[in-house]
From Swiss-Prot:
Active site feature: T2
Family annotation (SUPFAM superfamilies): N-terminal nucleophile aminohydrolases (Ntn hydrolases) (SSF56235)
Name of this protein: Proteasome subunit beta 1
An example Gene Ontology molecular-function term: threonine-type endopeptidase activity
Origin organism lineage: Archaea, Thermoproteota, Thermoprotei, Thermoproteales, Thermoproteaceae
BP term (GO), one: proteasomal protein catabolic process
Reaction it catalyzes: Cleavage of peptide bonds with very broad specificity
Free-text activity regulation comment from the record: The formation of the proteasomal ATPase PAN-20S proteasome complex, via the docking of the C-termini of PAN into the intersubunit pockets in the alpha-rings, triggers opening of the gate for substrate entry. Interconversion between the open-gate and close-gate conformations leads to a dynamic regulation of the 20S proteasome proteolysis activity.
Enzyme class, spelled out: hydrolase
UniProt keyword list: Autocatalytic cleavage, Cytoplasm, Hydrolase, Protease, Proteasome, Threonine protease, Zymogen
A cellular component term, taken from the record's GO annotations: cytoplasm
Residue positions assigned to the propeptide: 1
Function: Component of the proteasome core, a large protease complex with broad specificity involved in protein degradation.
Length: 201
Protein backbone atom coordinates (compact mmCIF):
# COMPACT_ATOMS: atom_id res chain seq x y z
CA UNK A 1 0.00 0.00 0.00
CA UNK A 2 1.46 3.28 -1.11
CA UNK A 3 1.10 6.15 -3.56
CA UNK A 4 3.57 7.00 -6.31
CA UNK A 5 3.14 9.62 -9.02
CA UNK A 6 4.99 10.52 -12.21
CA UNK A 7 4.57 13.52 -14.51
CA UNK A 8 6.49 14.24 -17.74
CA UNK A 9 6.66 17.78 -19.13
CA UNK A 10 8.88 19.43 -21.74
CA UNK A 11 11.53 20.50 -19.20
CA UNK A 12 11.83 17.18 -17.39
CA UNK A 13 10.20 14.52 -15.23
CA UNK A 14 8.74 14.75 -11.72
CA UNK A 15 8.42 11.68 -9.47
CA UNK A 16 6.65 11.92 -6.11
CA UNK A 17 5.72 9.40 -3.42
CA UNK A 18 4.39 9.24 0.11
CA UNK A 19 6.70 7.94 2.87
CA UNK A 20 4.55 5.37 4.71
CA UNK A 21 5.68 1.74 4.51
CA UNK A 22 3.06 -0.85 5.42
CA UNK A 23 2.96 -4.59 6.08
CA UNK A 24 -0.70 -5.43 5.66
CA UNK A 25 -2.53 -3.06 8.02
CA UNK A 26 0.59 -2.45 10.12
CA UNK A 27 2.66 0.72 9.62
CA UNK A 28 6.16 -0.72 9.41
CA UNK A 29 8.09 2.50 8.73
CA UNK A 30 7.29 6.21 8.58
CA UNK A 31 10.27 7.47 6.57
CA UNK A 32 10.44 5.05 3.64
CA UNK A 33 12.21 6.19 0.47
CA UNK A 34 10.28 4.99 -2.56
CA UNK A 35 12.19 6.74 -5.34
CA UNK A 36 15.19 4.76 -6.58
CA UNK A 37 17.97 6.52 -8.49
CA UNK A 38 19.06 4.25 -11.35
CA UNK A 39 21.45 6.76 -12.95
CA UNK A 40 21.81 10.54 -13.12
CA UNK A 41 19.20 10.74 -15.90
CA UNK A 42 16.66 8.13 -14.78
CA UNK A 43 14.86 6.94 -11.64
CA UNK A 44 11.99 4.67 -10.63
CA UNK A 45 9.26 4.64 -8.01
CA UNK A 46 8.55 1.67 -5.78
CA UNK A 47 5.09 0.16 -5.35
CA UNK A 48 4.59 -3.49 -4.44
CA UNK A 49 6.73 -5.97 -2.53
CA UNK A 50 9.80 -4.21 -1.15
CA UNK A 51 12.22 -7.14 -1.55
CA UNK A 52 11.04 -7.77 -5.12
CA UNK A 53 11.37 -4.08 -5.98
CA UNK A 54 14.84 -3.82 -4.50
CA UNK A 55 15.93 -6.87 -6.47
CA UNK A 56 14.51 -5.70 -9.81
CA UNK A 57 15.73 -2.11 -9.42
CA UNK A 58 19.20 -3.38 -8.48
CA UNK A 59 19.23 -5.29 -11.79
CA UNK A 60 18.30 -2.07 -13.62
CA UNK A 61 20.98 -0.05 -11.84
CA UNK A 62 23.61 -2.65 -12.71
CA UNK A 63 22.45 -2.75 -16.34
CA UNK A 64 22.66 1.05 -16.57
CA UNK A 65 26.24 0.98 -15.23
CA UNK A 66 27.27 -1.82 -17.60
CA UNK A 67 25.82 0.08 -20.56
CA UNK A 68 27.64 3.28 -19.61
CA UNK A 69 30.95 1.43 -19.23
CA UNK A 70 30.55 -0.36 -22.57
CA UNK A 71 29.15 2.46 -24.73
CA UNK A 72 30.51 5.53 -22.90
CA UNK A 73 27.06 7.13 -22.71
CA UNK A 74 23.94 6.82 -20.51
CA UNK A 75 21.54 4.01 -21.30
CA UNK A 76 18.47 5.05 -23.33
CA UNK A 77 15.41 4.89 -21.10
CA UNK A 78 13.48 2.78 -23.62
CA UNK A 79 16.28 0.17 -23.51
CA UNK A 80 16.07 0.10 -19.72
CA UNK A 81 12.30 -0.29 -19.85
CA UNK A 82 12.58 -3.14 -22.36
CA UNK A 83 15.03 -4.83 -19.99
CA UNK A 84 12.71 -4.60 -16.99
CA UNK A 85 9.83 -5.88 -19.12
CA UNK A 86 11.84 -8.99 -19.99
CA UNK A 87 12.83 -9.56 -16.35
CA UNK A 88 9.21 -9.36 -15.21
CA UNK A 89 7.75 -11.37 -18.10
CA UNK A 90 10.22 -14.26 -17.83
CA UNK A 91 9.93 -14.53 -14.04
CA UNK A 92 6.53 -16.23 -14.51
CA UNK A 93 4.97 -18.16 -12.88
CA UNK A 94 6.96 -16.91 -9.85
CA UNK A 95 6.25 -13.25 -10.50
CA UNK A 96 7.91 -10.25 -8.90
CA UNK A 97 5.27 -8.15 -7.10
CA UNK A 98 6.36 -4.91 -8.76
CA UNK A 99 4.48 -1.86 -10.04
CA UNK A 100 6.94 0.85 -10.96
CA UNK A 101 7.08 4.21 -12.70
CA UNK A 102 10.33 4.69 -14.63
CA UNK A 103 11.09 8.22 -15.74
CA UNK A 104 13.91 10.40 -16.91
CA UNK A 105 15.47 12.40 -19.71
CA UNK A 106 17.59 11.12 -22.60
CA UNK A 107 18.74 12.22 -26.07
CA UNK A 108 16.37 9.89 -27.91
CA UNK A 109 13.01 10.71 -26.30
CA UNK A 110 13.59 13.78 -24.16
CA UNK A 111 11.56 13.76 -20.93
CA UNK A 112 9.77 10.43 -20.82
CA UNK A 113 7.71 8.34 -18.40
CA UNK A 114 6.88 4.63 -18.44
CA UNK A 115 4.82 2.37 -16.19
CA UNK A 116 5.82 -1.29 -15.71
CA UNK A 117 3.67 -3.88 -13.92
CA UNK A 118 4.46 -7.31 -12.48
CA UNK A 119 3.45 -9.14 -15.68
CA UNK A 120 5.97 -7.18 -17.76
CA UNK A 121 3.43 -4.84 -19.34
CA UNK A 122 4.96 -1.46 -20.19
CA UNK A 123 3.07 1.69 -21.19
CA UNK A 124 4.34 5.15 -22.06
CA UNK A 125 2.54 7.89 -20.12
CA UNK A 126 2.49 11.68 -19.68
CA UNK A 127 1.24 11.25 -16.11
CA UNK A 128 0.53 8.18 -14.00
CA UNK A 129 -0.10 7.03 -10.42
CA UNK A 130 0.41 3.61 -8.83
CA UNK A 131 -0.33 2.02 -5.47
CA UNK A 132 -3.34 1.84 -3.18
CA UNK A 133 -3.75 5.63 -3.23
CA UNK A 134 -3.59 5.86 -7.02
CA UNK A 135 -7.35 6.40 -7.62
CA UNK A 136 -7.20 9.60 -5.54
CA UNK A 137 -3.89 10.74 -7.02
CA UNK A 138 -5.00 9.97 -10.59
CA UNK A 139 -8.10 12.12 -10.10
CA UNK A 140 -5.95 15.10 -9.13
CA UNK A 141 -3.62 14.47 -12.07
CA UNK A 142 -6.46 14.29 -14.59
CA UNK A 143 -7.90 17.59 -13.38
CA UNK A 144 -4.59 19.46 -13.16
CA UNK A 145 -2.36 18.13 -15.96
CA UNK A 146 -1.67 20.29 -19.02
CA UNK A 147 0.70 19.42 -21.85
CA UNK A 148 2.27 22.89 -21.75
CA UNK A 149 2.72 23.05 -17.96
CA UNK A 150 6.05 24.18 -16.48
CA UNK A 151 8.28 21.97 -14.37
CA UNK A 152 7.42 24.04 -11.29
CA UNK A 153 3.69 23.54 -11.94
CA UNK A 154 4.30 19.81 -12.41
CA UNK A 155 6.00 19.65 -8.99
CA UNK A 156 3.01 21.42 -7.41
CA UNK A 157 0.58 19.05 -9.15
CA UNK A 158 2.54 15.96 -8.06
CA UNK A 159 2.41 17.16 -4.46
CA UNK A 160 -1.35 17.80 -4.73
CA UNK A 161 -1.86 14.31 -6.16
CA UNK A 162 0.06 12.54 -3.39
CA UNK A 163 -1.59 14.76 -0.78
CA UNK A 164 -5.04 13.74 -2.09
CA UNK A 165 -4.05 10.11 -1.61
CA UNK A 166 -2.67 10.71 1.88
CA UNK A 167 -5.97 12.32 2.93
CA UNK A 168 -8.08 9.41 1.67
CA UNK A 169 -5.97 6.23 1.62
CA UNK A 170 -4.92 4.57 4.91
CA UNK A 171 -1.97 2.92 3.14
CA UNK A 172 -0.38 6.28 2.30
CA UNK A 173 0.98 8.91 4.67
CA UNK A 174 3.75 10.51 6.72
CA UNK A 175 5.00 13.01 4.12
CA UNK A 176 6.04 13.40 0.50
CA UNK A 177 9.28 12.86 -1.40
CA UNK A 178 9.73 14.65 -4.72
CA UNK A 179 12.46 14.12 -7.32
CA UNK A 180 12.99 16.17 -10.47
CA UNK A 181 15.07 14.95 -13.43
CA UNK A 182 16.17 17.43 -16.10
CA UNK A 183 18.74 17.32 -18.89
CA UNK A 184 20.79 20.14 -17.37
CA UNK A 185 20.81 19.13 -13.68
CA UNK A 186 20.03 15.42 -13.82
CA UNK A 187 18.54 13.78 -10.72
CA UNK A 188 17.78 16.05 -7.77
CA UNK A 189 15.57 15.83 -4.71
CA UNK A 190 13.18 18.71 -4.14
CA UNK A 191 11.79 19.94 -0.81
CA UNK A 192 8.91 22.40 -0.75
CA UNK A 193 6.67 24.27 1.66
CA UNK A 194 3.75 22.05 0.70
CA UNK A 195 5.68 19.04 1.95
CA UNK A 196 6.22 20.72 5.31
CA UNK A 197 2.46 21.29 5.55
CA UNK A 198 1.79 17.61 4.80
CA UNK A 199 4.29 16.57 7.47
CA UNK A 200 2.62 18.86 10.01
CA UNK A 201 -0.93 17.58 9.39
Amino acid sequence: MTTTVGIAVREGVVLATDKRVTAGYYIAHKQGEKIWKIDDHVAATMSGGVADLQSVLSFLTLRAREYKMEYKRPIPIRALVNYVSLILFYSRPYIYIVHSIIGGVDDEEGAVLYMADWLGTVTKERYIATGSGSPYAKGALEVGYREDMSLEDAVDLAIKAVKAAIRNDPGSGEGIDVVVITKREGFRRVFTAQQKIVLAE
